């Protein structure tokens, strides 16, 4: 709702948002604080803004409540302080953050029980049942989720390069942060990525209603916005603060210490080595953080050992980045990046013959061409050759015997 993506939910995925619209209209009046962001080429009509604002407010309040329940249910996340609803003084209309009381920009919350602020009202619970059913029964959405499970991963090693979205969580000194995943069991670096990948799939594939499904489902939320999550890479997400607190000092989302070290080549090499990427051309291909190209920021970090290619295709970030994202190319000659200019509008494209314009530049030119034997395909072929040679050797040594009857039939 905030980014005007209702068409995607309703038309593409067939999810009925009428129950949310009806509920928000009946329960909320003025909701201008939750007005959706206006995109220049898609101006809203006044009545749309009012309805979308109410819908945004209604689902946001439900989200704040459910997040409060989750962080207490999963204390191992260490995020009880993100139960924002329980920190509000409902009588005074303020919230205490780090010892300071901040006034809320909106104090009209008719569905909140001050003595139990994370509890859903009966109507909210019924609405969530309807929405969950709609999401679960959307064939296209479920097909996309299955595709993510079968083809996706939390990280990817390809031809000596390491691709991941967020970060490898690190401590202040640059060492890998350790996460407790069981009694006396801690994981860090690649081992934690593997654990997180398995738990995320568990949230989508474990039997419905099982403890494993519930644990994995909660962990999917943690991956999205959890403290030092390898996908999120920040201390917390300030959704509540941005919506309801005027003071922008509370909007900060402190980044993990990983981002303090990405300009150091040795740090990047340490990560590559820990994931088994030790080719001369090996690089980290990172996402998540918008590159402010219009301010001269480079997508290359750590003397070229890390490449950031995120932050542009989302229109909400294009005002910050000045571009519409990057595309990376890697072939036998080296690596190139293409920086794309934002797509203005269909009208402009037709009238002026403008399309998405791209500018390419070299990241690295290799001193010698990469051969098939140097990449993943070559390693797979070599592995098959090695297996066949072992079979041949076993045959010549008499370990494998030929069935003469079958040999004659052939």
What are these regions (language model features)?
Residues 1-410:
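Feature recognizes metal-dependent phosphohydrolase scaffolds
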């Amino acid at each position: 709702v905030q980014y005007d993506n209702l068409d995607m939910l309703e038309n593409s995925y067939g999810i009925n948002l009428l129950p949310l619209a009806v509920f928000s209209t009946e329960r909320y009046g003025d909701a201008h604080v939750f007005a959706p962001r206006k995109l220049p080429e898609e101006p809203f009509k006044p009545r749309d803004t009012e309805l979308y604002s109410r819908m945004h407010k209604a689902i946001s309040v439900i989200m704040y409540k459910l997040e409060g329940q989750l962080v207490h249910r999963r204390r191992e996340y260490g995020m009880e302080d993100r139960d924002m609803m329980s920190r509000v003084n409902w009588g005074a209309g303020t919230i205490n953050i780090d010892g300071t009381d901040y006034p809320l920009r909106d104090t009209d919350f008719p569905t909140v029980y001050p003595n139990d602020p994370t509890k859903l009202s009966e109507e909210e619970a019924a609405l969530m049942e309807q929405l969950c059913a709609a999401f679960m029964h959307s064939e296209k959405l479920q097909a996309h989720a299955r595709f993510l499970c079968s083809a996706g991963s939390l990280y990817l090693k390809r031809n000596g390069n390491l691709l991941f979205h967020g970060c490898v969580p690190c401590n202040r000194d640059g060492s890998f942060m350790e996460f407790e995943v069981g009694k006396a069991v801690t994981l860090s670096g690649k081992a934690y990525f593997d654990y997180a990948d398995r738990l995320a799939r568990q949230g989508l594939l474990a039997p419905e209603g099982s403890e494993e499904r519930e644990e994995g489902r909660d962990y999917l939320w943690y991956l999205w916005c959890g403290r030092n999550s390898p996908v999120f890479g920040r201390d917390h997400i300030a959704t509540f603060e941005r919506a309801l607190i005027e003071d922008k000092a509370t909007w900060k989302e402190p980044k993990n210490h990983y981002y303090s070290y990405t300009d150091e080549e040795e740090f990047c090499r340490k990560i590559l080595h820990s994931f088994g990427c030790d080719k001369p051309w090996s690089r980290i291909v990172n996402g998540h953080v918008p590159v402010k190209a219009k301010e001269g920021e480079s997508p290359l970090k750590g003397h070229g050992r890390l490449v950031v290619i995120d932050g542009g295709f989302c229109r909400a970030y294009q005002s910050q980045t000045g571009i519409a994202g990057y595309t990376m190319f890697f072939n036998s000659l080296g690596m190139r990046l293409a920086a794309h200019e934002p797509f203005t509008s269909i009208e402009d494209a037709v009238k002026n013959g403008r399309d998405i314009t791209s500018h390419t530049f070299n990241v690295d030119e290799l001193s010698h061409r990469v051969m098939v034997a140097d990449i993943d395909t070559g390693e797979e072929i070599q592995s098959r050759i090695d297996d066949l040679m072992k079979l041949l050797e076993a045959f010549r040594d008499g370990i494998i015997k030929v069935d003469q009857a079958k040999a004659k039939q052939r």
